[in-house]
A protein has these predicted regions:
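C-terminal engagement/docking regions of AAA+ P-loop ATPases
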Residues: 54-55, 64-67, 71, 75-118
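Short alpha-helical "recognition helix" segments of helix-turn-helix
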Residues: 47, 51-52
């Protein structure tokens, strides 16, 4: 997938999640892990542990900061952008649901853009 970090940054900003939140960075890390894996990692504990090792933070910090960023974006975003990237219209889901849906949407958009260029 074309530069997932850049595409996810644009999506998070579009959803009203500010870059100065720790969760913003951790969500980008999760998107990179999913891309390296070729699919979302279903055990979020593994994702949190990998990010915690990379960032030298504890797992609960990673989980809570991602959750806070998602909640913040959910309450400050235009509905259309939120549904586009997270797929759920203000219905509480798990971090894993949100991140997997976002990664899948970015992957689908990337595939559509490649098809348009042909």
């Amino acid at each position: 997938m074309a530069n997932i970090r850049e595409r996810a940054t644009d999506a998070l900003l579009d959803c009203g999640i500010p870059m100065n939140q720790s969760g913003f960075l951790y969500i980008l890390d999760a998107m990179e892990l999913f891309t390296e894996n070729g699919a979302p990692i279903t055990n979020m504990r593994v994702v949190y542990e990998m990010i915690a090792r990379k960032r030298k933070h504890n797992v609960s910090e990673i989980m809570e900061n991602i959750k806070y960023s998602i909640i913040f974006g959910n309450s400050n975003c235009r509905t259309g952008a939120w549904v586009r990237y997270f797929g759920f219209d203000f219905v509480p889901k798990t971090n894993g649901n949100y991140l997997a849906f976002m990664w899948e949407r970015l992957r689908e958009e990337d595939a559509r853009n490649k098809n348009k260029q042909r």
